[in-house]
Amino acid sequence: MNATPTARSAHVDTFARDHLPPRHEWPRLLLDGPGLRYPDRLNCGAELLDRTVERFGADRPAFRSGGLPPWPHPDPGDGRVPAPPRTWSYGRLRATVDGLARVLTGRMGVVPGNRVLLRGPTSPQLAACWLAVMKAGAVAVTVLATQRAPELRTICRLARVRHALCDAQSAGELHRAEVPGLHVGLFGHGGPDDVLRDDVVRDDALRDGELRDGALRAEPPGRRPRFEAVDTAADDVALIAFTSGTTGRPKGCVHFHRDVLAVADTFSARILRPRPDDVFAGTPPLGFTFGLGGLVVFPLRAGACALLDRWSGAARTLRVVQRHGVSVLFTAPTAYRAMLEQLERPDADGPWDISSLRRCVSAGEHLPAATWHAWHERTGLRLIDGIGATEMLHIFLSAADDAIRPGRTGFPVPGYQARIVAPDGVTPLPDGTPGLLAVRGPVGCRYLADERQREYVRDGWNVTGDTYVRESDGRFRFVARADDMIVSAGYNIAGPEVEEALLRHPRVREAAVVGRPDARRGQIAVAHVVPEPDAEAYPNAGADGDAGPDAGADADGQRDRQRDGHAEGNPREGRAERVERAERSAREGRAEQEGELAELAEELREFLLAELAPYKCPRAFVFTDRLPRTPTGKLQRFRLREAERDHPDADPE
């Protein structure tokens, strides 16, 4: 079925719909499978919230929070400002969402189809804002709380955003963006204009003539007036998710109300198979579609509960699992490796208890087989690998339970099809041959007014930019992102394959392999390695003889101490002698360090030669104390590639 907008749109503001790609550039959508035949008219906010309340009741827990700063919520009885309830029932959530939808369509003047920017840390309040935008028939543009003013300005310009709901603590950059005509509603500060305060909601209801004076204050949340969701078409635009823009102008990925339900009815329903008593948690923010699906859409669709909070670090993640009885966890491979290390260090209260976990999803980057095996050996749990894309909204290749094979992403999620194609994006390749991954299913890429649509969608298929191999048993094995392939002297080297081999070495904690321009070979492979703490390598130094950016810190410190009159040694030494001695000591220390780094690099070379073909072995090693990552732990290889292009030894001629 090739679905294009046909039903009458509920949008008054038709900008998003008007700026979809031409229909002949759309991917072919598959909507004939089990559970994917949706009615022409549906509102995903009503389906996720109102229909769930009807099925499971209003008293079930929907969201939990814990560890966030107190959310001011004035008590009309005594004026105190207590912390928010730690558990939001489905009834409380619906009352909050309906009240906020009334604020949006009342005092803020939002009409169906308007784009509403959402900004703030992961919290029940931010999720309530998203649901309110859905029920109001508007279009959610959820951004990261860490994005800066220039990024926000660009997103608002591309999506023509004129309304925003923003956590008060995240408002600074949005104000600095100076978006013309932007109407911002703040929440979380408890002031008279807090859009989530009960009295703000009450006043809007009174203006609408829905209640007598004081009636809302006297009614419990479950009995407050309902906001009837806008009667949107299934193919009305629900959200625009912007890519990170690391390669230039960010791309706005447009998804419909139907798409939101489709990802829940495929990956979640068929792979995760959630239960109403599940507790979901994870590290991805709601500004990423990985987080939106895993922490809002999937649990609500199943009538389950989600922990919506912000935290970082392996110990904190384990405490969250232990304290809240988390059963479904979403995070990146790096986080699972860090948790494995933390599990060996008991908490202050004793050994870690993560026995509540039953589903662990890994996505965002390649899951090394070594990480899978280590997690399974330590916990008995089989990590669920998956690949998704902002263009596809969520995961489309995966496997669960006995179908899982370490080192293999898996099969197309039921409802999707996948194949491997040549660089032209069209010609199918046989099993066992590396090529570009092409996929189609109930959702697909539709960029907002962007000529790059023709690059991503070829012949009705979404060509993701990932290099994969389809094996004879039908499983798909990740090779590399297309831009992670290193071409050296005519050989193709997949950086992730070399990284996975490096991670099998006991002295390697993290690794990333990228290309460096080279006149003779085109590129050479360079391994950036974070050694284990007990390795005889010092952070931030290059093993090819070049000191890293911090390699001279000790000498600088010595010079500072000399200037302060604290140089050690013979008090009869003159100042010049002391300086010379300190610098000689620093040179000797650097020489010793470089020797140890060279030994470690040689050890890793020998190890890799036993694991991989010789041409795949990196020709240079750079040792560092950390690799660049996003807030969710995803490796930023593009930063390493930029550093290699600027490296003194880089020779592109």
Language-model features: locations:
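Conserved AMP-binding/adenylation subdomain of ANL enzymes
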Residues: 261-279, 286-328, 342-348
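Gly/Ser/Thr-rich phosphate-binding loop
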Residues: 326-331, 342-405, 417
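Conserved beta-loop-beta connector loops within the AMP-binding
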Residues: 419-438, 471-473, 595-601, 636
